[in-house]
Amino acid sequence: MVKSHMGSWILVLFVVTWSDVGLCKKRPKPGGGWNTGGSRYPGQGSPGGNRYPPQGGGGWGQPHGGGWGQPHGGGWGQPHGGGWGQPHGGGWGQGGGAHGQWNKPSKPKTSMKHVAGAAAAGAVVGGLGGYMLGSAMSRPLIHFGNDYEDRYYRENMYRYPNQVYYKPVDQYSNQNSFVHDCVNITVKQHTVTTTTKGENFTETDVKMMERVVEQMCITQYQREYQASYGRGASVIFSSPPVILLISFLIFLIVG
């Protein structure tokens, strides 16, 4: 009888917890205004004023009709009619216009989950549209079908890349799409970089390079796929509703 009541209360607690989590997910995030931290791209005004000051109708050193050091008709050290340290008539750190802002915009907060994911996946390469550079690999031993190409590869393999460029696996529908994109961007970047140094590649070089990079891209996909699968499983089993459900099932089995 006692176990039956305990099982009922645990079931009710599970339903309440699950509902609360669902409601939390549906609640809209509060919108952020200027300097509230809600904007992903905060304002770019400099703390000392506008980088390009407005051009009013006053003479040299007399913006907006005021005297020397008197912008907008205020007294000495009183911009826009406010007191000392009060731009635009506001208090200290309460600028009222698009220029002359005193308080710095708050920096956007970076989620630790995103930082950890980026560190685990690889370093993002600037200027390549979100591509990441994988860790160094050993160049695979490949047989090309004839002695000449096999010997040529062994003698020139050091000239081919040992790292690949790639995007997260969740942006592709299958392995083939990932590998195709990975090979294209890696061969292109390596060819351009090497050509600027005065070294050119022959058709044989490009053919062998594509084969080598293809094998490395397949290896990179397998690594990223396994890592992504592991992170997804850990997130699922660490959520409170799942933990409560597992505990309830264990209680029913043991009881």
Curated annotation (Swiss-Prot):
Cysteine pairs bridged by disulfides in the record: C182-C217
Cell compartments where the protein resides: Cell membrane; Golgi apparatus
Span list, region Disordered: 27-110
SUPFAM superfamilies (alphabetical): Prion-like
UniProt membrane topology term: Lipid-anchor; GPI-anchor
Signal peptide residues on this chain, from the entry's feature table: 1-24
Name this polypeptide is given: Major prion protein
Organism, as annotated: Camelus dromedarius
